[in-house]
UniProtKB/Swiss-Prot annotation:
Substrate binds at residues 115-116, 223, 251-253. Pathway: Glycan biosynthesis; glycogen biosynthesis. This is UTP--glucose-1-phosphate uridylyltransferase. It comes from Sus scrofa (Pig). Keywords: Acetylation, Cytoplasm, Magnesium, Metal-binding, Nucleotidyltransferase, Phosphoprotein, Transferase. GO terms for molecular function: metal ion binding; UTP:glucose-1-phosphate uridylyltransferase activity. Its main location: cytoplasm. Residues 502-503 are annotated as: Critical for end-to-end subunit interaction. The modification N6-acetyllysine is found at residue 438. SUPFAM superfamilies: Nucleotide-diphospho-sugar transferases (SSF53448). It is an enzyme of class 2 (transferase). The modification Phosphothreonine is found at residue 426. UTP--glucose-1-phosphate uridylyltransferase catalyzing the conversion of glucose-1-phosphate into UDP-glucose, a crucial precursor for the production of glycogen.
């Protein structure tokens, strides 16, 4: 906890302390304002307006950060949502499709969140450029999906990438390869906010550059920034002018987040005549999902509650699969007109996520972020849809990558679907150890991806390699202890087996 926050806490515990607390807060805001003004003076003329918008946005967020303390929800007010506010996907699908699918598709814009790097998987550059299936990247698959829609229905669904300053340059270099695809591709940038020193709460950056000493001084402030940066880019007004009505927003690493025509039809032709301004796709929790944000009823509106907002005594209750059965997939359908209205009224309310980081030099900093789904409570007639698990297929680790590269899935026009040869619709639980964390190491350890159609659970730990045409079935646990190595031989069939010890296979 910073010295300033400690001072504030002490001040609050004393009589008449609120006035003292307000003085400290105002002094701190003034100090931050001066620092930001100094930084702005270093902006080149062609970047001045853009930088000013970013720093103004940060100031508003910082002001709110100083006002809010403690958990942001009153647990006593949290209720289960009314049944009609979260619809089962089957009910949406049962309505069928309109006669003229192209007319509803032409009202849609697809937005992919493309601000993340591949560092957690040992890759440099944007995560969207990592190969995930038959040498296709996340971005390749996305373009293929939308091109397939446009060709099939003779439509003009554009793709918009929300980049960050970390991914923008590399992404733009690659976009020329899609020039001959039937997809118009647009990009805009997330804001760039300054990290603040955890003790002084002042910006770490001394100027606008993000090279040299300033490399770690800036950050993209979470995907909740989409509303302001999309509006500021001018694209929002452009699409409204073209007659577009909804954006479908999702993470680019969620391979299940394809355009769903049934959900789109429900939006364009609401059964009760009242248009939904915001739809969140949620899916049933499994054991691994207990920390995911969940939809609740709060003060009469649908609200996304994240684990960080929950008071500590209620965290276990929040994780309970029996009480809170679904979690947010971050597949969102949002009205463009509503975004414009709320943005112009400054009425989009999102909780602040305080994300502590330690820089390479050891300095402790804070970055203030927001999440796109948290804005659900600001929109009118919001709806949750409980979708099948197949619409949530994120690739966060090489364990996830193994699943999507395997014969569990087939690839068609950029979309992955579970193989009909798998008897169970559930996905196996795969845990690969630290030797597999980096994509480069992971690929080196598999001569070919094993047959996993009958696999339930795979755990691999230590120095392990797989030969060609290996088949894994049931529960398979492979543990090579420190100093040992296990080579699974080509053609091996492992069914309900624990493999340990030392097994070397060398070329003769």
């Amino acid at each position: 906890m910073s010295r300033f926050v400690q001072d504030l806490s002490k001040a609050m515990s004393q009589d008449g302390a609120s006035q003292f607390q307000e003085v400290i807060r105002q002094e701190l805001e003034l100090s931050v304002k001066k620092e930001l003004e100094k930084i702005l003076t270093t902006a080149p003329s062609h970047e001045f307006e853009h930088t000013k918008k970013d720093l103004d946005g940060f100031r508003k967020l910082f002001h709110r950060f100083l006002q809010e303390k403690g958990p942001s929800v009153d647990w006593g007010k949290i209720q289960r949502p009314p049944e009609d506010s979260i619809q089962p996907y089957e009910k949406i699908k049962a309505r069928g499709l309109p006669d003229n699918i192209s007319s509803v598709l032409n009202k849609l814009v697809v937005v992919k969140l493309n601000g993340g790097l591949g560092t957690s998987m040992g890759c440099k550059g944007p995560k969207s450029l990592i190969g995930v299936r038959n040498e296709n990247t996340f971005l390749d698959l996305t373009v293929q999906q939308i091109e397939h829609l446009n060709k099939t229905y003779n439509t003009d669904v554009p793709l918009v990438l929300m980049n960050s300053f970390n991914t923008d340059e590399d992404t733009k270099k690659i976009l020329q390869k899609y020039n001959h695809c039937r997809v118009k591709i647009y990009t805009f940038n997330q804001s760039r906010y300054p990290r603040i020193n955890k003790e002084s709460l002042l910006p770490v950056a001394k100027d606008v550059s993000y090279s040299g000493e300033n490399t770690e001084a800036w950050y993209p402030p979470g995907h909740g920034d989409i509303y302001a940066s999309f509006y500021n880019s001018g694209l929002l007004d452009t699409f409204i002018g073209e007659g577009k009505e909804y954006i479908f927003v999702s993470n680019i690493d969620n391979l299940g987040a394809t355009v769903d025509l049934y959900i789109l039809n429900h939006l364009m032709n609401p059964p009760n005549g009242r248009p939904c301004e915001f739809v969140m796709e949620a899916t049933n929790k499994a054991r691994a999902d207990v920390k995911g944000g969940t939809l609740t009823q709060y003060e009469g509106k649908l609200r996304l509650v994240e684990i960080a907002q929950v008071p500590k005594p209620h965290v276990d209750e929040f994780k309970s699969v029996s009480k809170f059965k679904i979690f947010n997939t971050n597949n969102l359908w949002i009205s463009l007109a509503a975004v414009k209205r709320l943005q112009e009224q400054n009425a989009i309310d999102m909780e602040i996520i305080v994300n502590p980081k330690t820089l390479d030099g050891g300095l402790n900093v804070i970055q203030l972020e927001t999440a796109v789904g948290a804005a659900i409570k600001s929109f009118e007639n919001s709806l949750g849809i409980n979708v099948p698990r197949s619409r949530f297929l994120p690739v966060k680790t090489t364990s996830d990558l193994l699943l999507v590269m395997s014969n569990l899935y087939s690839l068609n026009a950029g979309s992955l679907t579970m193989s009909e040869k798998r008897e169970f619709p559930t996905v196996p639980l795969v845990k690969l150890g630290s030797s597999f964390t980096k994509v480069q190491d992971y690929l080196r350890r598999f001569e070919s991806i094993p047959d996993m159609l009958e696999l339930d659970h795979l755990t691999v730990s230590g120095d392990v390699t797989f030969g060609k045409n290996v088949s894994l079935k049931g529960t398979v646990i492979i543990i090579x202890n420190h100093g040992d190595r296990i080579d699974i031989p080509p053609g091996a069939v492992l069914e309900n087996k624990i493999v340990s010890g030392n097994l070397r296979i060398l070329d003769h």
